[in-house]
Amino acid sequence: MAEQPGKALVPEIRFSGFTDPWEQRKLDEVASKRIEKNTNEIKETFTNSAEHGIVSQLDYFDHDITNDANIGNYSVVYPDDFVYNPRISTIAPCGPINRNKLGRNGVMSPLYTVFSVDDVINKLYLEYYFKTNSWHQFMFLEGNSGARSDRFSISDSTFFEMPIQCPVLEEQELIASFFNRLDSLITLHQRKYCGVASWMLGVALVRLGSESDGAFGEMKHVLR
């Protein structure tokens, strides 16, 4: 992002047809914190993984670590809501922010910050924005790791002061679409690579089996 006279935000590389500077808005100008608490009507608990995004707790832990007695104070999460998890890791040094793409309601621990976004910002654009480290500097300046070394500490009021770089909606949509297609292409090639790698491993085991006895010899018959 190049900074022009007057501190206008103008990206050095952008789609053709767009010349206006990007705006910098605070998160609370485009999003609102969810304050709705569960009334024990929603039974499914979600978790926010830095690697896998928002997933059902049953899928992530192989069992539900909550029960009806302790989820009454949990926050309700709706489809397309965003969730900040203060748990830090190597790939999420100040905690991950992910979007609920499960297509259903759930509840999450009150340790998480849940927020919905307005129509002034494209949800997919914001999702990719939070996959970058553009917002990390603000977090490191305004928050800290707290008493627990695995938790990032920042107040809600400060969190929602986070600056967000916002082009016009049409440009947001193009940026989001571009990265979405890129992700799909990467996934496709990863699957092809895994398929080729598995085939090569099979060939190697068969060749080894033809040259020796024992387990590799038995493997040859399994792979046929």
Name each model-derived stretch.
Residues M1-R224:
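Feature detects amphipathic, helix-rich regulatory segments
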